[in-house]
Regions:
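Residue-level signal for short segments within beta-strands and strand-turn junctions
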Residues: 77, 93, 156-158
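Bacterial Sec-dependent N-terminal signal peptides
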Residues: 1-32
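Short linear motifs in intrinsically disordered
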Residues: 62-65, 109-111, 131-134
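A short, acidic/glycine-rich surface segment
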Residues: 92-98, 162-163
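Core segments of cupin and vicinal oxygen chelate
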Residues: 35-39, 45-90, 124, 140-142
């Protein structure tokens, strides 16, 4: 009887430890996956000869609600449809230095989660981090350089503050 009880206790203990370790390992894997998760497109930025004319043309012919920075598209987040998300569309002057060191006429902004941890992971992987993380009321930003030399903007958004800023500027979103 004592031997059977000890065997059952040993099996139960092994099962519990195994379950606990699996949970810890799975959680770490989930955290690592989450750390690198791009949640969407935060912005499309491109060079043009005359940003004002470009904004006017897109407003007139395609109905974009433009402001001094371009247009903001409002959408609902897939993971939680009660939350809004935003994507910025911005024409830049062809002489802008903002896209440097890239020589391309465009830059894409990706929405991400946990920017600090992501940057640390990217550093370990040898990805070129072009600058330091900057923090604004509406989110955190950093630039990286991809494999073809394109400057890429990573944004951990604060959508609530971003929406407030848009309202303060009198900007309407394109839906």
């Amino acid at each position: 009887m004592k031997k059977t009880t000890l065997i059952i206790l040993a099996i139960a203990t092994s099962f519990c430890f195994g379950f606990a370790f699996k949970t810890i390992i799975t959680k770490q894997s989930d955290d690592q996956t989450k750390m690198k998760k791009v949640t969407g497109i935060g912005g499309i930025f491109f060079k043009c000869k005359d940003p004002n004319k470009m904004r006017e043309w897109y407003q007139k012919h395609l109905g974009l609600n433009t402001n001094q920075y371009g247009a903001v598209f409002e959408w609902r987040q897939g993971a939680d449809t009660t939350k809004k998300g935003f994507t910025q569309w911005s024409p830049f002057a062809e002489t802008t230095k903002y896209f440097e060191p890239s020589t391309k006429d465009f830059m894409i902004n990706y929405r991400v989660e946990n920017l600090e941890a992501l940057v640390e992971e990217l550093k370990k992987e040898g990805v070129v981090i072009a600058d330091k993380i900057e923090t604004a009321e509406y989110g955190k930003f950093v630039h990286i350089i991809d494999v073809e030399g394109n400057k890429v903007e990573l944004w951990e958004p604060n959508d609530i503050e971003y929406e407030k800023l848009g309202k303060q500027l009198g900007s309407m979103t394109t839906k």
